[in-house]
Amino acid sequence: SFKAYGGEILGVAGIAGSGQKELCETIAGLDRAVSGDIIFKGESIRSLTPRDIIKRGITMSFVPEDRLGMGLVGEMSIIDNVMLKSYQNLPGIMMDRTEGRKVADDIIEKLEVATPSPYHIVKKLSGGNIQKVLLGREINLNPDLLITAYPVRGLDIGASYLIYDILNEQKKKGVGVLFIGED
């Protein structure tokens, strides 16, 4: 049992196979809790689907461990991945291409993504750059809770520090950050 609050980073660590990833997926509504409850802003979300969570105005973002399986669509460009995610927050319409380009450019600049353009295909990026695009896309949604599963796994030290800095910026903005890791 634990409580996470806005403006703080809560770390959950454990050995491989101890259930951290499942915890993330359950809180994000991607898996069902077997027991217990998940209370978000005073409301139980245990039985809600991700779509129901969005409909209730509950804003949380999930940065999964599997960057190209559950995170980004590898065959699509950076801009298309940014625009695709925006669809869930806009009633019935997608972000237009101009706005998508602006957001993608901001993510590329702020997170120092090494890419020739926002139209670059995601699967051609390095693992660290894919992680930066994924994190940038999620924080662009201005969540109340940002759930991250192993956000620095496999990244070089420079990329890891940048990710830590971005997570600390989110904390300073009042976002609750749930950081799942092994150490």
Where are these regions (language model features)?
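Glycine-rich phosphate-binding loops of nucleotide-dependent enzymes
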Residues: 1-183
